[in-house]
UniProtKB/Swiss-Prot annotation:
Intracellular or extracellular location(s): Cell inner membrane
A Pfam family hit: ABC_tran
One Gene Ontology cellular component: plasma membrane
Originating gene: metN
Keywords: Amino-acid transport, ATP-binding, Cell inner membrane, Cell membrane, Membrane, Nucleotide-binding, Translocase, Transport
The UniProt record lists the keyword Repeat: no
Function: Part of the ABC transporter complex MetNIQ involved in methionine import. Responsible for energy coupling to the transport system.
Organism field: Cupriavidus pinatubonensis (strain JMP 134 / LMG 1197) (Cupriavidus necator (strain JMP 134))
GO molecular function: ABC-type D-methionine transporter activity; ATP binding; ATP hydrolysis activity
Binding-site residues for ATP, renumbered to this chain: G38, R39, S40, G41, A42, G43, K44, S45
Protein name: Methionine import ATP-binding protein MetN
EC number in record: 7.4.2.11
Family in the record: Belongs to the ABC transporter superfamily. Methionine importer (TC 3.A.1.24) family.
Length: 344
């Protein structure tokens, strides 16, 4: 559905050119919810604005629905953009227009008749849960409701792609969850391809199928969300996952562990389970099979896209050969095993 091929974006700066994007290539499938995450200044917003050519890339190609947007003239590009809706952190509603009229605005600009507008807007307001508020003004509704208006307005032209640029970052956690649930519903019911730009790994965890991690304008990691959580490869990814799932041992645990390491019999590991592995007694089986003692130091169970995800930090006590064999056994059972060589 969306192909980004070798995108680079350079801007003039006070001390030379600023490289906002560096050779970014991504493939996003039709009907997919794809997340793009990174820290501030990583190039996320520049990238999402390149998808609909609000920012024309310095080099590279943007292909949406088989059409190379970078090759279009201005008139053809305006038509192509009708297939791409966009929502923002700031709602950008017109204060003098009602909820209904804000959603209707792009249809009015497209020259639709009053009956055509009504036939489109009313079902959209029902979809986003705002039918009873259609005659209210932006000053009379909440932030979450304003974002729902923004979503309905973005859907008014019946796009095939919805771009979300930090759309929940100004909302409280409860409202954020409700907006993410709405986006999942829209994806499910309309088959819409959604690209989520965010700095919050919690958003990625809740709604996305796949994710790309940006750092300094480059894609440093990409994959299914569950796989990225299980096996983060880049330090930026590990740090951002740590914001939602504790990766470090608590200080009180570190003090107890430190005194026992180095004796040759105690080894600390981080174990990650997913799916059916969360429900299986694999630790008990390893203890019985290899005659070891396992001390659980820290644990966490969560859910990613409806799939159970568990993380444990354990201290395994026993002969080194037996400990290694037990870890290999756990890996054979689908457990991701990482030895924590330095805990302090």
């Amino acid at each position: 559905m969306i192909e980004l091929q070798g995108l680079s974006q350079r801007f003039p700066g006070g001390s030379g050119e600023v490289h906002a994007l560096r050779d970014v290539s991504l493939s996003i499938g039709a009907g997919e919810v794809f997340g793009i995450i990174g820290r501030s200044g990583a190039g996320k917003s520049t990238l999402v604005r390149a998808i609909n050519l609000l920012n024309r890339p310095t080099s590279g190609r943007v292909i949406v629905g088989g059409q190379d947007l970078t090759a279009l003239d201005n008139g053809a590009l305006r038509l192509a953009r009708r297939d791409i809706g966009m929502i923002f952190q700031h709602f950008n509603l017109l204060s003098s227009r009602t909820v209904f009229d804000n959603v209707a605005l792009p249809l009015e600009l497209a020259g639709k008749t009053k009956s055509e507008i009504e036939a489109t807007v009313l079902p959209l307001l029902d979809l986003v849960g705002l039918s009873v508020l259609k005659d209210r003004y932006p000053s009379q509704i909440s932030g979450g409701q304003k974002q729902r208006v923004g979503i309905a307005r973005a859907l008014a032209s019946k796009p095939k792609v919805l771009l979300s640029d930090e759309a929940t970052s100004a909302l409280d956690p409860e409202t954020t969850r409700s907006i993410l649930d709405l986006l999942k519903q829209i994806n499910r019911e309309l088959g819409l391809t959604i690209v989520m730009i965010t700095h919050q790994m919690e958003v990625i965890k809740q709604v996305c199928d796949r994710v790309a991690v940006l750092e300094a304008g480059r894609v440093v990691e990409e994959g299914r969300v569950i796989d990225v959580f299980l096996r983060p490869q880049h330090e930026v990814t590990r740090a951002m996952i740590g914001d939602v799932i504790a990766q470090e041992l608590p200080e009180s645990v570190l003090k107890r562990v430190e005194s026992r390491l180095g004796n040759g019999r105690d080894h600390v590991y981080r174990l990650a389970f997913t799916g059916e592995g969360v429900d299986q007694p694999v630790l008990a089986q390893a203890i019985r099979r290899y005659g070891l003692d396992f001390n659980i130091l820290h644990g966490h169970i969560d859910e990613i896209q409806g799939q159970a995800f568990g993380s444990l930090a354990i201290m395994a006590t026993g002969e080194l050969a037996d400990v290694k064999a037990a870890m290999e056994y756990l890996q054979q059972q689908g457990v991701v095993v990482e030895e924590i060589e330095h805990v302090v």
